[in-house]
A protein has these predicted regions:
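Conserved serine/cysteine hydrolase catalytic core
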Residues: 198-258
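Alpha/beta-hydrolase fold catalytic core
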Residues: 1-41, 63-64, 105, 287-294
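Short beta-to-alpha linker loops that shape the active-site pocket of alpha/beta-hydrolase fold enzymes
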Residues: 71-76, 140, 271-272
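Conserved alpha/beta-hydrolase catalytic His-Asp/Glu region
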Residues: 162-216
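Active-site loop/oxyanion-hole signature of alpha/beta-hydrolase fold enzymes
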Residues: 56, 69-111
Length: 294
């Protein structure tokens, strides 16, 4: 067992923090505090994911740097939106700016997985002064239609299970190609990040099914996102790509390096979309990124 996993078993090292969005939603994040003056990290999860995806990083950092994991509106412990049209990156950026204002954070290192990486790029374009560094996890300005179709086929499709083992087996069947080396124990841990137990004791997805309504599955490149990426030109940036990713191609990743003067690309072997950030090679790359940022 890795040291940070043991710490997770011993205690809860974070605080739950809530703030209100401009349209009155109660939003949530997990805040792992630190006595360090180092620039804090803000983690932004993928489309159907939540703050729990990043918990291990809080224990891995072990207080050396403050790290905050956001539940985007409609996910985890954040309130569901009254208008599904607000499930879009520009609104997520506004929500996170509100959080930074509440916490009096002038800037942060942004860790964005998938949708969270899109939010990070748009944040860089709209508020470049807020970013001290960036991790773009298996995401770029141009997306493969095959991966988007796969995501579009499952997002918003509600399902529930009797036990965590049932949920884990279903994930193993549907996502085995993404994590071919996962054991049953890994799948159960993965399920506990994606699902939650409802009041009836059923295991259900931990997000608002309406997040699927604004979802665009056409794929291709986005001129807006390529332009947004230019805002990270001189910012220390780590690009992680899953070797087996069906959403983020190697060609797009290399094209991004032509723009990012301080960009570093690391490929995570035998992983699809998206790396969990628990892989040793991912943690080594994250450590190297943070050493470049005060």
């Amino acid at each position: 067992m890795r040291d940070y996993e043991q710490k997770m078993l011993q205690s809860q090292n974070y605080e739950d923090y809530f703030w209100e969005s401009e349209d009155g939603l109660k939003l949530h994040c997990r805040d792992f505090p630190s006595d360090s003056d180092a620039t804090p990290i803000i983690c932004v999860p993928g489309l159907t994911r939540n703050a729990r995806d990043f918990d291990h990083l809080g224990d891995w950092l072990d207080g050396s740097r403050r790290i905050i994991m956001v539940d985007l509106r409609g996910r985890g412990m954040s309130e569901y939106a009254k208008d599904s049209a607000t499930y879009n990156p520009k609104t997520y950026v506004a929500d996170i700016i509100g959080l930074m204002d509440k916490l009096k954070l002038p800037k942060a290192v942004f860790f964005g997985t998938s949708l969270g990486g899109i939010v990070t790029m748009i944040m860089a374009a709209a508020h470049p002064e807020k970013l001290a560094g960036a991790l773009l996890n298996d995401i770029g300005p141009e997306l493969d239609p095959a991966g988007l179709k796969r995501i579009g086929d499952y997002v918003g499709q509600g399902c529930s299970f009797d036990t965590w083992a049932h949920a884990a087996r279903d994930l193993a069947e549907s996502s085995g190609d993404i994590f071919p080396d996962f054991t049953l124990k890994d799948w159960i841990a993965f399920a506990k990040k994606i699902y939650t137990m409802n009041n009836s004791g059923r295991i259900k997805l931990d997000y608002d099914m309406k997040i699927s309504e604004p979802f665009d599955s056409k794929g291709g490149g986005s001129g807006i996102l390529w332009k947004a990426l230019e805002s990270l030109e001189s910012t220390p940036t780590l690009i992680l790509r899953g070797e087996l990713s069906d959403l983020f191609s190697a060609n797009v990743a290399l094209k991004m390096l032509e723009i990012l003067k301080q960009g570093v690309l690391v490929t995570v072997p035998r992983v699809g979309h998206a790396p969990t950030l628990e892989e040793p090679i991912a943690l080594e790359a994250i450590d190297a990124l943070l050493k470049r940022i005060a």
